[in-house]
Amino acid sequence: MNLLIPAAGIGRRMGGSRNKLLLTLLGKSLLSWTLEAAVKSDHITWIGIIGQPIDFPDFQKNISDLSTDKHIELIEGGATRQESVYNGLQALPSAAERVLIHDGARCLATPELLDRCAVEILKCPGIIASVPVKDTIKVVDPSGIIQDTPNRRNLWAAQTPQGFDVKLLKECHKKGQILGWEVTDDAALFEKCGLPVKILEGEETNLKVTTPLDLKIAEFILLKAL
């Protein structure tokens, strides 16, 4: 299975100007934790890290610290996550039929989750790891007045990995470019093209490290697991 890791983001909500995936968590970068899970996965054989060239020396050091014979490639990203994933799709091996896409900032994803996603994507054109929403969600108008309270049983919080048929996802990206779609994940492109995306239950601990508080929570979770 092929895995693309978007890793081009700047951690502005972290209060810094550097790539947040280079921040340290228990002595290792966030990217290193993500890569370790990918390397331990039984199904992942090819890994592409999508980032900016300025970060490549640091990424290469993270790769060098790993003990693996899996192919890991550095791919230049774009101005947005959407553009970066598109670049990653072009860099996939020519024989690639399926791909998993996993945010590098979700550094607590387990090898088991990656493997479950790798198996499930062979059965359908699109999958997304998600967890049931526990909070009551309110839909509000621009002035902050509640308009609706959706049934919580129908709500899932999207995570990654997300998995797709490579040919279909490339077509969705091209259509999105032509029509000017701006989306925050690849499942949304599939949805806009009328293609099915199946929910696969993710992991409660698979949080996205976005703020300093997230970093503290991730540290707590790792200390409990080690």
Swiss-Prot record:
One GO biological process term: isopentenyl diphosphate biosynthetic process, methylerythritol 4-phosphate pathway
Annotated site (Positions MEP for the nucleophilic attack): 152, 208
Keyword Nucleotidyltransferase: yes
The protein's annotated pathway: Isoprenoid biosynthesis; isopentenyl diphosphate biosynthesis via DXP pathway; isopentenyl diphosphate from 1-deoxy-D-xylulose 5-phosphate: step 2/6
Domain of life: Bacteria
EC number: 2.7.7.60
Alphabetical list of Pfam families matching this protein: IspD
Class in the EC hierarchy, top level: transferase
Keyword Iron: no
Record-marked site positions (Transition state stabilizer): 13, 20
Function in brief: Catalyzes the formation of 4-diphosphocytidyl-2-C-methyl-D-erythritol from CTP and 2-C-methyl-D-erythritol 4-phosphate (MEP).
Protein name (record): 2-C-methyl-D-erythritol 4-phosphate cytidylyltransferase
Protein source organism: Trichodesmium erythraeum (strain IMS101)
